[in-house]
């Protein structure tokens, strides 16, 4: 610190050491923060951090890329600020912790924006050109928002999944997993959005309530004799009747190809007014009530006995096109929780149906698949051709009723799959797609993808720990990954496929590398414009370019390949130490990254996974436009300061929901002010202190100063332990307690008399300032990861010759001999002080004293308390902030008490103590003896406080 005082007020007759500081009481954050952002950028602070960290062990937090579309919202702020706290705290812990931000650039949302602005008929080359420009514009907007929040990083050189080198490396990653044998092409039901016109990833599906028709439908007997035999009857009692299914998707009935029963469930043949009905025995009573029928069980048989029986399609009498029969297959997935215990199977529209029919010998060409990509039936479908499936639902119900097959129809509200972009219902739809097989044995006969990924989960540290089971169960139960998409703005699956067989070209791996080289030079547009003959010559007569693009989750899911080991390999490394995202990313980026790394490397791409919750309002409700309870981080930053957002995030247990409201922000702001006031006190009282010139050796410090430094060092050890485990809210809570109670409520309160009234250059005052110097060093560094603007502002006052607080590491406090015993002793003293303060307050309330300095106290103490109190000698009064203090020994704790009496002496004009020696010097009648000594003689001697 400089030994120059700030401009001081006119000197009083008996001056005290009341110093000022350029660090203002009011933060004026909305005005000052943008100036710091500008200064950090202009002065290259991030680059200076990198230079200072060079050669240290690396710590890599890999940034999960936000999508390059739209303004940043509060969820973005939570995510980026948590990452910033981690990175800054790891740098200060002695690591080289770079932060390379990234953006996810391809995919549907941007393509939709281009369609909205320019229509759907743009040539592919123009779509790509405009998509690139749009993504670039969005990135620049978001970048400004993130920097405004105080996030330091390599903003000049972020990674973008649309950069040519990243696109090229993604194609190479695709080549890697093909080479290993994980990729296959097949017909399979996938999540399909009619509005997207494309398959969806699991992470792009959300569930919302929807009301649909629920129907019970009878499939009439096609083999009455065999059916009778299955139930142990010589013949069916009557010809009418059949087997009954229940479904909430009437639109799948035209595509029915089978019926599924559980092998062990007992099925009943029930005689009713509508004929003989086959229903699970335990569902008979409920179904009869639902169908408003009376029934008598004629016979029963387990499902296994009914296998391979055939029944007529329920629309067989309505149109010749439905004159087919459905076989009974057995499936363990059939239950009797609801419905009839019989499941109708349209294999083109359900994964379990598909697997069951495949297992029973159906080939891809056998599947009836009448729903087109836009959600309409093909024109040739009998009765319903050209209709959208949702419009067809009621017409199918009517047709079933007219055919005599309908037993019941009602409205049913259930949780149903929707597209996360369009918020519209989606279906499973069998299409020819490229898949990564979860249970495929790779060519090296190593572990399957599922096995490798589950091992990766086990090897990963999770924060919080419950994330492990969540990700494990998702991987354990997930279907094969649909890699392909039917879009334009995406990285191509740059294959050449045989026009007749659909087989890959035998030189596929070599060709992928050739395409990657071109993409590296010109982007994915190089594939669009490529004439196949350039690469495969005359083979172009037999092979054509595959038109599918890669799932965007493959884009971001391979950043461990094309960023950590690709575009930014000089700064980053594989595996990353930490991936940090919202808890939805267990099925998103965490998930896709784990799968791709398991295929390419046989391991997880991260050592640790940290998840945070979502933001909610003060009442725990999710933020939504309809509720009008959203909080805009820009608005809060411009009104209260980004520092308040940072402090709110750091002080909240992010493992659950993060609640925010005006009341919560008000409390955060009050907490901020307490920290700021502490810093202001420290800086003001160091403004005439130069460490090189004024520092006092540790062994010459007053005892309370040694205690304060020992206590602060112990606290720092605790805080760094929390930082290491990414536990930020205990860091904030303990620092707020430290500032308000340990410093403001105790140490600094005791120190004021010594700082203000001791001789300016006395050992007593310089001892206090030396301790404050160390405390300030320590405090600013542990605050810096989350209160970045304030710590930097204070640091520039405290260490003006230093570039930035962010190139520092956590402070090495000086060793204090016997620190543990000292901390224990002063904990006792603080406990006694609490009792004294309470007694003083009672005396003040009773009008026996005014301020605490008007009091003289006698503390009755026993044992260790007595020893601790007497060890302070006459300095005890300074600790208790009274004008006099004596200690009386008692036998035990039960006899301990505090006596308070008003001093009978005069008040010193300068120090405000009431002392017998006020006026002892005739020339200075209002001054006490110690103030006279401090001003005109050698000064008082203090040893403890």
UniProtKB/Swiss-Prot annotation:
Gene for this chain: ileS
GO cellular component assignments: cytosol
Residue interval(s) of motif 'HIGH' region: 66-76
Task performed by this protein: Catalyzes the attachment of isoleucine to tRNA(Ile). As IleRS can inadvertently accommodate and process structurally similar amino acids such as valine, to avoid such errors it has two additional distinct tRNA(Ile)-dependent editing activities. One activity is designated as 'pretransfer' editing and involves the hydrolysis of activated Val-AMP. The other activity is designated 'posttransfer' editing and involves deacylation of mischarged Val-tRNA(Ile).
Residue ranges annotated as motif 'KMSKS' region: 622-626
Keyword set includes Coiled coil: no
Domain notes: IleRS has two distinct active sites: one for aminoacylation and one for editing. The misactivated valine is translocated from the active site to the editing site, which sterically excludes the correctly activated isoleucine. The single editing site contains two valyl binding pockets, one specific for each substrate (Val-AMP or Val-tRNA(Ile)).
Catalytic activity: tRNA(Ile) + L-isoleucine + ATP = L-isoleucyl-tRNA(Ile) + AMP + diphosphate
CC cofactor note: Binds 1 zinc ion per subunit.
Gene3D superfamilies reported in the protein's UniProt record: 1.10.730.20, HUPs, Valyl/Leucyl/Isoleucyl-tRNA synthetase, editing domain
Subunit structure, interactors included: Monomer.
InterPro entries per UniProt: aa-tRNA-synth_I_CS, aa-tRNA-synth_Ia, Anticodon_Ile_BEm, Ile-tRNA-ligase, Ile-tRNA-ligase_type1, Ile-tRNA_ligase, M/V/L/I-tRNA-synth_anticd-bd, Rossmann-like_a/b/a_fold
Entry binding sites for ATP: 625
Names of the cofactor(s): Zn(2+)
Family that this chain belongs to: Belongs to the class-I aminoacyl-tRNA synthetase family. IleS type 1 subfamily.
Compartment(s) where it occurs, according to its Swiss-Prot or TrEMBL record: Cytoplasm
Keywords for the protein's UniProt record, in alphabetical order: Aminoacyl-tRNA synthetase, ATP-binding, Cytoplasm, Ligase, Metal-binding, Nucleotide-binding, Protein biosynthesis, Zinc
UniProt binding sites for Zn(2+): 908, 911, 928, 931
Pfam families with a match to the protein in the record: Anticodon_1, tRNA-synt_1, zf-FPG_IleRS
Organism the protein comes from: Burkholderia ambifaria (strain ATCC BAA-244 / DSM 16087 / CCUG 44356 / LMG 19182 / AMMD)
EC number: 6.1.1.5
Protein name listed in UniProt: Isoleucine--tRNA ligase
GO MF annotation list: aminoacyl-tRNA deacylase activity; ATP binding; isoleucine-tRNA ligase activity; tRNA binding; zinc ion binding
Binding locations of L-isoleucyl-5'-AMP: 581
Family annotation (CDD domains): Anticodon_Ia_Ile_BEm, IleRS_core
């Amino acid at each position: 610190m400089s030994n120059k005082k700030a401009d001081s007020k006119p000197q009083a007759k008996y001056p005290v050491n009341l110093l000022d500081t350029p660090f203002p009481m009011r933060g004026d954050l909305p005005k000052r923060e943008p100036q710091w952002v500008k200064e950090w950028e202009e002065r290259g602070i991030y680059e200076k951090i990198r230079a200072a960290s060079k050669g240290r062990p690396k710590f890599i937090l890999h940034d999960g890329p936000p999508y390059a579309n739209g303004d940043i919202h509060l969820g973005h702020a939570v995510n980026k600020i948590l990452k910033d706290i981690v990175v800054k705290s790891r740098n200060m812990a002695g690591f080289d912790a770079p932060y390379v931000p990234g953006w996810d650039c391809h995919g549907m949302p941007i393509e939709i924006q281009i369609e909205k602005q320019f229509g759907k008929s743009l040539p592919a080359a123009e779509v790509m050109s405009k998509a690139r420009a749009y993504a670039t514009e969005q990135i620049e907007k978001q970048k400004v928002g993130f920097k405004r929040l105080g996030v330091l990083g390599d903003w000049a050189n972020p990674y973008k999944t649309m950069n040519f080198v990243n696109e090229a490396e993604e194609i190479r990653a695709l080549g890697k997993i093909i080479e290993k044998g994980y990729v296959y092409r097949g017909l399979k039901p996938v999540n399909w959005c009619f509005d997207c016109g494309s398959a969806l990833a699991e992470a792009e599906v959300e569930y919302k309530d929807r009301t649909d028709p629920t129907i019970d439908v009878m499939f009439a007997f096609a083999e009455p004799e065999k059916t009778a035999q299955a139930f142990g009857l010589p013949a069916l009692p009557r010809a009418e009747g059949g087997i009954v299914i229940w479904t909430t998707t009437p639109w799948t009935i035209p595509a029915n190809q089978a019926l599924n029963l559980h092998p062990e469930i007992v099925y009943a043949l029930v005689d009713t007014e509508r004929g003989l009905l086959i229903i699970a025995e335990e569902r008979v009573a409920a179904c009869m009530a639902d169908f408003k029928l009376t029934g008598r069980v004629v016979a029963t048989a387990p499902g296994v006995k009914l296998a391979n029986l055939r029944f007529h399609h329920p629309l067989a009498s309505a149109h010749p096109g439905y004159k087919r029969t459905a076989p009974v297959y057995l499936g363990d997935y059939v239950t009797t929780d609801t419905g009839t215990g019989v499941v109708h199977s349209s294999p083109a529209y359900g994964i379990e149906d598909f697997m069951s029919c495949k297992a029973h010998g159906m080939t891809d060409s056998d599947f009836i698949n009448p729903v087109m990509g836009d959600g309409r039936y093909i024109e040739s479908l009998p009765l319903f051709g050209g209709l959208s499936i949702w419009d067809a639902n009621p017409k199918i119900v009517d047709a079933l009723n007219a055919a005599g097959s309908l037993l019941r129809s009602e409205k049913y509200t259930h949780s149903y799959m929707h597209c996360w972009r369009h918020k519209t219902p989606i279906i499973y739809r069998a299409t020819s797609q490229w898949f990564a097989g979860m249970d495929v044995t790779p060519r090296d006969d190593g572990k399957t993808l599922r096995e490798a990924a589950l091992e990766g989960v086990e090897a990963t540290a999770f924060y919080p720990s419950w994330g492990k089971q969540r990700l494990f169960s998702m991987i354990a139960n997930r279907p094969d990954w649909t890699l392909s998409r039917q879009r334009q703005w995406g990285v191509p699956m740059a294959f050449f496929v045989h026009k007749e067989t659909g087989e890959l070209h035998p030189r596929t791996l070599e060709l992928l590398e050739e395409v990657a080289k071109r993409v590296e030079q010109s982007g994915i547009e190089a594939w669009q414009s490529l004439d196949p003959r350039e690469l495969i010559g005359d083979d172009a007569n037999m092979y054509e370019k595959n038109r599918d693009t890669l799932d965007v989750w493959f884009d971001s899911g391979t950043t461990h390949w094309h960023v950590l080991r690709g575009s930014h390999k000089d700064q980053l490394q594989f595996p990353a130490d930490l991936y940090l995202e919202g808890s939805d990313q267990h099925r998103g980026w965490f998930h896709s990254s784990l799968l791709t790394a398991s295929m390419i490397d046989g391991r997880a791409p991260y050592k640790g996974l940290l998840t945070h919750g979502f933001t909610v309002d003060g009442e725990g409700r999710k933020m939504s436009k309809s509720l009008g309870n959203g909080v805009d981080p820009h608005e809060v930053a411009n009104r209260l300061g980004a520092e308040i957002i940072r402090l709110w995030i750091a002080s909240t247990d992010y493992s659950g929901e993060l609640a925010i409201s005006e009341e919560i922000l008000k409390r955060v702001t009050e907490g901020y002010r307490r920290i700021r006031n502490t810093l202001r006190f420290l800086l003001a009282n160091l403004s005439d202190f130069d460490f090189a010139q004024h520092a006092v050796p540790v062994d010459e410090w007053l005892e309370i100063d040694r205690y304060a430094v020992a206590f602060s060092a112990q606290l720092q050890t605790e805080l760094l332990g929390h930082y290491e485990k990414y536990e930020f809210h205990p860091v904030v809570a303990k620092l707020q307690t430290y500032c308000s109670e340990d410093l403001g409520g105790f140490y600094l309160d005791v120190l004021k008399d010594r700082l203000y009234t001791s001789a300016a250059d006395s050992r007593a005052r310089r001892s206090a300032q030396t301790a404050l110097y160390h405390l300030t060093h320590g405090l600013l560094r542990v605050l810096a990861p989350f209160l970045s603007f304030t710590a930097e502002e204070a640091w520039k006052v405290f260490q003006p010759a230093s570039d930035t607080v962010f190139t520092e590491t956590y402070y090495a406090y000086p060793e204090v001999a016997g620190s543990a015993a000292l901390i224990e002793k002063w904990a006792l003293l603080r406990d006694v002080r609490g009792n004294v303060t309470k007694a003083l307050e009672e005396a003040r309330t009773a009008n026996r004293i005014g301020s605490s300095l008007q009091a003289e106290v006698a503390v009755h103490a026993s044992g260790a308390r007595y020893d601790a109190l007497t060890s302070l000698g006459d300095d005890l009064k300074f600790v208790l902030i009274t004008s006099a203090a004596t200690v009386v020994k008692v036998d035990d704790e039960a006899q301990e008490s505090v006596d308070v009496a008003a001093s009978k002496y005069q008040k010193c004009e300068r120090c405000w103590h009431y002392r017998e020696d006020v006026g002892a010097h005739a020339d200075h009648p209002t001054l006490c003896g110690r103030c006279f000594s401090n001003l005109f003689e050698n000064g008082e001697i203090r040893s403890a406080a």
